[in-house]
Amino acid sequence: MTLLRPTCIAVAMILAGCTAQAPSAETGAPAPAVADAPPATPAPTPSTLGTEPVLGPQPVAALGVGPDGSPLDPMDEAHAPVAAPDHKANDVATTTGADGVLRAQVLLLRQHFSTGEIDGKAGMNVAKAVRAFQKSHGLTVSGELDDATWAALNQDSAPVLMTYTLTQKDIDGPYAPTPERAEDKAKMDRIVYQTMLEMLGERYNAKPELLQSLNPDADFSKAGATLVVPYTRPAQSLPKAGRIVVDKSDGALQLLDADGKLFAQFPASTGSSKFPLPIGEWKLTSVVQDPDYRYNPDILVGQPKDAKPATLPPGPNGPVGIVWMGINKQHYGIHGTPEPGHISRTQSSGCVRLTNFAAQAVATAVEVGTPVTFQE
């Protein structure tokens, strides 16, 4: 299926969460919200520019995203791995301390069991990724990095840290501060990353502070500078998912195959007491890359009294990030975020929120009609 990047797909966070809709072909204005949930397999609606919503899987992104939030070319030779020299995390014997955690985080991610932003720190997201990996590989499920788990992870022999040379494109961006008010966001062409360091963090699914600690003497403002970064290319592409399962208590999104076997997991933010996750059985109705966002202050909490409705442009720092996957319940879906460090640590407005890195990965494995289970 040919991938189209829609420029006018409006995504609204309405009442309990978010929804994706196509603009009116006659006026170019966002289509009004409807009372009923969208059909399970909606027909594509052309926008004023002749594009259509993306209703199928996206191509695999090799190492995350570029400066404008777009997927990097999987065949880009600039991202071929060259092991970072003399770093303990690249040593298979490293199993403890911060370097051991860093090694585990990268290896888990390459097996599609994400710990969220890679930061070299143990915590709840590491433990639940380890548990899921152990379950999927028939190991004793403990959440601990025991010898058997390390043996399974170390079947992947590629380096966990590689060198990367900054390009002029990396330096040039575009980058821009993200305004606080929606009306100011609406004036932007794209809601891009604020800094190159933020972009690099999302490209390699790493906390920006980790990149700084790995490169204490690097000049991040100079094209040609060599950096040490996590090598996050998956060992294998994700297969087609038979089902998405979002577990509220575990704060995770899982992908299962047609036989119900777990093969991937990503941390997720899954609603709040005010806007709870809609427990039940659903299905995907859309998979939209680069969605716009419809802002309606009348139905959102804590908005300025003088705020007005606005359609915000797409971009990685938009409210729903770079991917929207809608379900057949009005206003609800699975999407990215401008704040990857908050995933699984803060609540959402009813939708399922992933890092942009994770949302893009999930979108490669699903399609319209994929069953979705939201469970306690």
Feature roles, as predicted:
Residues T19-A22:
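Bacterial signal peptide processing site
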Residues M124-K128, A132-D170, Q212-P239, R243:
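Extracellular LysM carbohydrate-binding repeats and other cell-envelope/extracellular binding modules
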Residues T96-S142:
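A short amphipathic alpha-helical interaction element
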Residues S237-T337:
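Gly/Pro-biased beta-strand-loop elements
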Residues L15-G17:
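C-terminal motif of bacterial Sec signal peptides marking the signal peptidase cleavage site
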Residues S24-A78:
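Post-signal peptide N-terminal segment of mature Sec-exported envelope proteins
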Residues K305-E376:
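Exported/periplasmic cell-wall-interacting domains
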Residues A104-L108, D119, A129-Q134, M196-R203, ...:
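Short alpha-helical segments in extracytoplasmic peptidoglycan/chitin-binding modules
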